[in-house]
């Protein structure tokens, strides 16, 4: 079992590692081609898409993967995935429509709404077709997804490189290149699963749909709150700081997003066997604490390296125009260690089927982040947003530890 988990993790980490390495070149070209203001418009559009993309998460992997592990029969898994896909696609279309409505209502400039409309097509692709990734995770076999990601990423990089070296500096052109990636990945995922799935078309099961929506709703609310907590800073910053400073802050968060995704990959690779596969809550709790401890150590080591090499990273990625990003990255990198610990601890409420707790946690994190940002940003500018990022992550970690302690107490009482 350990060898299988280790092999799966290596493939997932290799996938993310290659994405980060290639992302260095992509970000370097993007920042240099668009400049600080154009880069700020692009990142703001991505933030809007990121928030809207949380809507299809109403039937997330946290709901689908444990069910797939519990019912591995091909016909049962096929029916489950078909219903999850229908739910996600419906939500994805709604999410894209809501994003477009927001752009129209707020009368965003063309530099924002055009790239947002293009990038937003991913809302209807990533999560709906991502049910195949959940199927792979349940089988602890992520290698095909890694290959598909590489193919899609190669196409995106080729297009961006062509735009950059031909001197194109239009934000919509680069947004189109980014939108190609999820389209190719979705097509490959659909081909891979359908070539191996049962040939029968699952009949519509209203009770299964209700169960998936009901069980996924609180996790979905928590994801929505989490996404808002992660992107509220940029929405608050835009009217309060110059566009160039917003670009510097967005550059910092982009580096950290790439870095902290490693935590999600580690958790996704370990959870099916070491957490979701446990028979007792106490065994799962112990494993979650071990996972969280190991992930914290990895996060701390990575954060220290990132902070020490911040000047070199910024110069390589963004160039001299993003000098303010160096200080922001050093401060935020150290705070990102808390993200690794929180992601590990978040496996426990998923195992215990306590989405209400997750939703409450992220509601408090969002509230804390917004309050700190509204107080600190007018006084400290982008550094105030970094403070909000750190305090919000600390609140998430504390609440995760509280749940782990409560779970231990409840287990002790039940066994007494």
Q: Positions of the model-derived regions?
A:
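Membrane-interface junctions at transmembrane-helix termini in multi-pass inner-membrane proteins
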Residues: 125-149, 334-361
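Hydrophobic alpha-helical transmembrane segments
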Residues: 113-120, 146-197, 364-368, 382-406
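Membrane-water interface segments that mark the loop-to-transmembrane alpha-helix transition
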Residues: 7-23, 45, 49-50, 54-103, ...
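Transmembrane helix-bundle signature of multi-pass secondary active exporters and lipid flippases
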Residues: 42, 46-54, 226, 249-268, ...
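Signature of the first transmembrane helix
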Residues: 3-61, 214-243, 369-370, 389, ...
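Interfacial segments at transmembrane-helix termini and the short loops linking adjacent helices
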Residues: 36-40, 103-119, 243, 307-340, ...
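Interhelical loop/hinge segments that connect adjacent transmembrane helices in multipass membrane
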Residues: 1-5, 143, 171-177, 187-230, ...
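Helix-loop junctions and terminal segments of transmembrane helices
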Residues: 23, 56-73, 138, 256-281, ...
């Amino acid at each position: 079992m350990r060898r299988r988990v280790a092999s799966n993790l290596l493939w997932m980490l290799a996938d993310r590692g290659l994405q980060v390495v290639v992302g260095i070149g992509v970000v370097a070209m993007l920042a240099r081609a668009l400049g600080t203001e154009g880069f700020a418009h692009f990142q703001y559009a991505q933030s809007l898409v990121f928030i809207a993309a949380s809507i299809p998460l109403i039937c997330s992997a946290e709901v689908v993967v444990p069910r797939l592990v519990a019912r591995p029969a091909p016909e049962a898994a096929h029916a489950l995935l078909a219903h999850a896909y229908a739910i996600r696609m419906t939500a994805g279309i709604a999410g894209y429509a809501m994003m477009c409505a927001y752009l129209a209502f707020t009368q965003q400039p063309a530099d924002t709404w055009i790239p947002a409309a293009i990038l937003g097509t991913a809302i209807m692709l990533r999560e709906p077709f991502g049910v195949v990734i959940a199927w792979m995770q349940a089988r602890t076999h992520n290698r095909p997804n890694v290959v598909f990601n590489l193919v899609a990423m190669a196409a995106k990089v080729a297009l961006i490189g062509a735009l950059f070296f031909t001197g194109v500096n239009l934000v919509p052109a680069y947004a189109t290149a980014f939108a190609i990636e999820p389209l190719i990945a979705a097509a490959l995922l659909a081909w891979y699963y359908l070539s191996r799935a049962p040939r029968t078309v699952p009949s519509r099961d209203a009770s299964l749909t209700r169960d998936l929506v009901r069980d996924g709703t609180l996790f979905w609310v928590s994801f929505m709150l989490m996404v808002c907590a992660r992107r509220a800073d940029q929405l608050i910053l835009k009217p309060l700081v110059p566009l160039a400073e917003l670009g510097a802050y967005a550059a910092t968060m982009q580096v950290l997003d790439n870095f902290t995704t490693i935590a999600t990959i580690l958790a996704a690779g370990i959870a099916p066997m070491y957490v979701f596969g446990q028979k007792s809550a106490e065994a799962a709790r112990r494993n979650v604490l071990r996972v969280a401890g190991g992930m914290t150590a990895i996060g701390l080591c990575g954060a220290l390296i990132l902070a020490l090499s911040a000047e070199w990273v910024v110069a390589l990625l963004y160039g001299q125009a993003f000098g303010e990003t160096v200080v922001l990255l050093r401060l935020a990198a150290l705070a990102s260690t808390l993200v690794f610990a929180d992601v590990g601890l978040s496996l426990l409420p998923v195992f215990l089927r306590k989405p209400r707790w997750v939703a409450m946690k992220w509601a408090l994190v969002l509230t804390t982040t917004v309050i700190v940002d509204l107080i600190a940003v007018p006084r400290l500018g982008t550094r105030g947003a970094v403070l909000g990022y750190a305090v919000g992550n600390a609140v998430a970690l504390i609440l995760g530890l509280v749940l782990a302690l409560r779970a231990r107490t409840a287990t002790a009482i039940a066994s007494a």
